[in-house]
Structures are given as C-alpha cells and as structure tokens.
Curated annotation (Swiss-Prot):
Pfam families: Adenylsucc_synt (PF00709). This is Adenylosuccinate synthetase. The keyword Acetylation does not apply. The lineage of its organism: Bacteria, Bacillati, Actinomycetota, Actinomycetes, Mycobacteriales. Belongs to the adenylosuccinate synthetase family. IMP binds at residues 13-16, 38-41, 129, 143, 224, 239, 303. Binds 1 Mg(2+) ion per subunit.
Length: 431
C-alpha cells in the first residue's frame, strides 16, 4: 500500500491532529517527519478526553498503530520523556513508539541561544517559540549536531558535546553575556535521560520501507504548515524545516514514488501565530468572533492566534507546491451564525490585481485582499455526518472553496470530536 502525506496548507494550527486521528485506525504506521516541540496537535477522543501532543505522533492514541519519530525531527529529550509520562499517566500504551536513530537531539545550548537571540532581536524578532528548534537545525546543516544514535556510545557523545560547547559557550559568554554550560553536566543529564528512550531507537527508514513492501499503510504527519516552510513559506517568518510534502520523503527515508496521496488540511478560515504577513487578518469584531468561537490559542505556546477570512490564494499555492490530491476542511462549524462569509480570491499589490502568491516578501507584506462575499448560514451543523446534512449555503461554501483551492474536499470537520467529521471521499481508497 502506498504512503499518505498529511500536511497543513496554511500557517499551521489547521487541525492536523484530528485528521491523523481519523485515519489512524486504518493505517499501520504514523510517522512524524519534521519539526520539534514547537508545534502541537490536539486530539479529542469520543469519550471527550483531550490530548495535546507536541513531539509524539497522533497515532499513539490508536491501538495497533506503530508510531515513528522520523529522522527529520529534532527531539528534545526532556520534552519527549515528559510527554510520554503524561500519556502513560492517563493510561495510554506508549510501547508502540519508535525513534529514528538519525533524528537530531535538541540540546540545552540550543534553547539558551534561541531565547537570547530572539530577545536581542527586539522589534525585528521572527516570533520563534524559543524552544531551540532553529539552532538545532543549524547544527544539523553545519554537520556538528548530535543524533539520537550517539547516546549509544558514551565516548562519541562526550566528544561531540565538548566540541559543540567549545564554540557555543563563546557565543553565550562573549556575545550575549550569559553563563557557560558545563560539558560534563550536559553529558550526565543526557545520559540519564537516554535511559528512558534508548530502547525505542530504531532503523526507521528500513522498517518503514519494509512495511510498504508488506502492503502496510504508512501515514506521514507533518507539523506546522505550508506557509511556514523554510523554502516555500513567508520567509523569514517561517520554521527551520520543510513541512511541505517534499519534506515527508526526506524526513522519513521513504522514496517519493511511494507517496500517492497528499491530504492537505485547511481551516475554513485562516489563522497565524507569531510575526509575518497575513493579508486577510481581521482586527474587528469578526476577528474576535473567530478567535473566541474557534478557541484560537496555540497548543504549544499558549499564544493567541491571529485570525482572518479564508485565503484562496494561499490555498491554491499550497495545492501546487505540495501536489495536494485531497483536502480536509476543518472548523466549518465556527462559521455558523455569520450573515455573510467573505473569501479572499485575490490581492491587490500597489493597485494591481494579483491572483497568485506574490513572488517577493515585500509584495506579500503589501498585499490587500480582494473579497468575494458568500452567504452565511445560521444552523448548528455540529451534528451533521453526511454532506447532504449541511445547510445549502454551507455546502455552497465548501464547494466554492474546493473550486478556488483546486483539490477535492474529501473530509469536513464540524466540531472538535473524533466523530464530528463528514467524509465525502475515502482518501485511503481513493488511489
């Protein structure tokens, strides 16, 4: 069976956890392929239990699914162990979690540098979560990072930590006037933490390819969203990895020809956390309504999300750069009780109409939305389970978004619960 990629098609927080949870019972493997604990997935079970996950794949809540933290992820050992304990304390079986030997470890000096650099940036800050994600990826690209497998060889680990701190301490002490970190202390803490996850280390790329050869279904789960991709997002206000579909193959070790379905997650409106351009952002009572009704607070950071109307320009862009075959539209229920629902169908930049994503950062920052007004609906749709159960105006809204985005809306979320989903097309059987 081929692999399926699940990605955010906006600026993250689209509801990927709900989509993964929906498909989790029908796949054998769920893989997180990039990012770190700078993003969160929320899963609400039929019992009403709410789980917020940051590093661990959403499939951990589905019995019989093997979950993998892939080589493209940066892993904070302390966060990993805390998250595991939190799940186990609530009765979740975590024995089905594996960690790629090639994933990079997020170290204390990454967090220290991330926080101090962002603080010094002042008004020019990017809006990082301060979790050390960027500095960890910097070390990975510079080939001086520490990988998960390094904890299996204490001598190698000690040498790598000492070499890293020889430079990192110079930065912390001489540039930012911060206290130096002791190599022996960092090593001791990491070795102690490693006792809690060493048994999970695996050759993930081998296991995943063998699974596909055995006709098992593999779901590749991205964090953040397309517009936060370091290459294809609104740079420099982006993350340090590739949440887009191309990153799924690199971050898991699966060949790209194995992937036949790319499921994009779209919120029925748009949100963003942190700094950066946001053409449809609202500063009026409508923005406040979306934030309150949609519960728009970041799972990981606790920061309030910026809210705006649906942006079809970025949806079309996401469809193209990811090769999206299907969409999961979430939070349609939040739009109930609005008289009209504006949809951004294009921009004006310096008075000129633009229907596609502007090429430059400065043009995106100056983009003004061009809206198409769609009629709203007043009915409560949280109980709808078939597309025909939706009011006609809600159906028209979905079909118009589908037309503008350029890919079929296969699933629709009408509430936070696992069962509050309309399935128009089975994405696992579609190809």
């Amino acid at each position: 069976m081929p692999a399926i990629v699940l990605i955010g098609a906006q600026w993250g927080d689209e509801g990927k956890g709900k989509a993964t949870d929906l498909l989790g019972g029908r796949v054998q493997w769920v893989v997180r392929y990039q990012g770190g604990n700078n993003a969160g997935h929320t899963v609400v079970l039929p019992t009403g239990e709410n789980f917020a996950l940051h590093l661990i794949p959403s499939g951990i809540l589905t019995p019989g699914v093997t979950n993998v933290i892939g080589n493209g992820v940066v892993v904070d050992p302390g966060v990993l162990l805390t998250e595991l304990k939190g799940l186990e304390d609530r009765g979740v079986d975590t024995s089905n979690l594996l960690i790629s030997a090639d994933a990079h470890l997020l170290m204390p000096y990454h967090v220290a540098i991330d926080k101090v650099v962002e603080r010094w940036a002042g008004s020019k800050k990017i809006g990082t979560t301060g979790r050390g994600i960027g500095p960890c990826y910097q070390d990975k690209i510079a080939r001086i990072g520490i990988r998960v497998a390094d904890v299996l060889d204490e001598q190698v680990l000690a040498e790598k930590i000492e070499a890293a701190l020889e430079f990192k301490n110079q930065v912390l002490v001489k540039i930012y006037n911060r206290k130096a970190l002791e190599p022996a202390e960092v090593l001791e803490n990491l070795l102690e933490q490693a006792e809690g996850f060493k048994h999970r280390i695996a050759d993930a790329r081998l296991l995943l390819n063998q699974a596909l050869e055995n006709d098992e279904a593999v779901l590749l789960e991205g964090s953040q969203g397309t517009l936060l991709d370091v290459d294809h997002g609104t740079y420099p206000f982006v993350t340090s990895s590739n949440p887009t579909a191309g990153g799924a193959a690199v971050g898991s070790g699966i060949g790209p020809t194995r992937i036949t379905t790319v499921l994009g997650i779209l919120k029925a409106y748009t949100t963003r956390v942190g700094s950066g351009p946001f053409p449809t952002e609202l500063f009026d009572e409508h923005g406040a309504y979306l934030a309150k009704t949609g519960g728009e607070v970041g799972v990981t950071t606790g920061r309030a999300r910026r809210c705006g109307w649906f942006d079809a320009v970025i949806a079309r862009y996401a469809t193209r750069v990811n090769g999206i075959t299907d969409y999961f539209l979430t939070k349609l229920d939040v739009l109930s009780s609005l008289e009209t629902v504006p949809v951004c169908v294009g921009y004006t930049v310096d008075g000129k109409r633009v229907d596609e994503m502007p090429m430059t950062q400065s043009d995106i920052a100056r983009a003004e939305p061009v809206y198409e007004e769609l009629p709203g609906w007043w009915e409560d749709i949280s109980g709808a389970r078939e597309f025909e159960d939706l009011p006609a105006k809600a159906r028209d809204y979905v079909l118009r978004l589908e037309e503008l985005a350029g890919a079929y809306v296969s699933c629709i979320g009408v509430g936070p619960g696992r069962d509050q989903t309309i399935v128009r097309r089975d994405v696992l059987a579609a190809r």
